[in-house]
Structure formats: C-alpha cells, structure tokens
Amino acid sequence: MIMLRDELSGYKKPSFIPGDVVRNVRYHYRGVIVASDFMCMADENWYQSNKTQPDKDQPWYHVLVHESGSITYPAESSLELDESGEQVVHPLLDQFFSDFEEGRYVRNDIPWPEKNS
C-alpha cells in the first residue's frame, strides 16, 4: 500500500488532474492543467502581489492559458471544469500532451523537468 508522507496527509486531494481543461471563475480564461501542488508553493511576495489571496492551504495548479503564451498559478477555488469540449491553443502544449480525447488532454512520453533543476 502506498502511504503519503505525514506532512502531506492533511492536505486536500486535488480535484483536477493534468490534462483537465478548466476555466478561471474570476478572470474567465480557459486553460489546461499541467501540474498541481497540495498547497501554494509560491513565495510570500508573489502571493501578496496578487489582486486576491485565496487560501494557501488548498491545491494550486500550473495552467497553460488558452490563446496565450502565459502560464498561471491559480488556487483550486478559482477554477471550474470547462465542459465546452474545445481544445486549448498554447505554444507549450506539445511539451506535455500528445492528444485531445473526450474533452481532456492525454499525457505524452516526454519526461517532465524535475522541480528545482
């Protein structure tokens, strides 16, 4: 049986997974999830510089923004599943995904970069 490390066991499991297409409920942009963190991992200066400060103790996501070269880092409370069935257009999509099936992206075989490398 796989056990989470004690320090992670108290965190909420992310509702979205890599490949899910989401919509930001506040700013209304669409994007695709590429990764998640159990809690906000951004530094305090970045967090305080945002227009809003959602709870840090919830999942946060790395999102490729549709029709943009941008990557955002929203909290789970800022996102909802996008059920339009429409694809996301982003220059980095091929770095993470190989296909789009049934409204979500399929992970490719390219190894993802290690954090802090």
Predicted stretch roles:
Residues 1-21, 27-30, 37-40, 111-117:
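Mixed-charge, Lys/Arg-rich low-complexity intrinsically disordered regions
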Residues 11, 27-29, 47, 61, ...:
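Sequence-level detector for tyrosine residue identity
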Residues 25, 34, 66:
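Structured beta-strand/turn binding interfaces of compact recognition modules in eukaryotic regulators
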Residues 34-36, 76:
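Surface loops and adjacent helix of pleckstrin homology
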Residues 40-49:
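Short, solvent-exposed secondary-structure boundary/capping segments
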Residues 52:
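Phosphate-recognition beta-domain surfaces
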Residues 56-117:
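Intrinsically disordered, low-complexity, charged/polar segments
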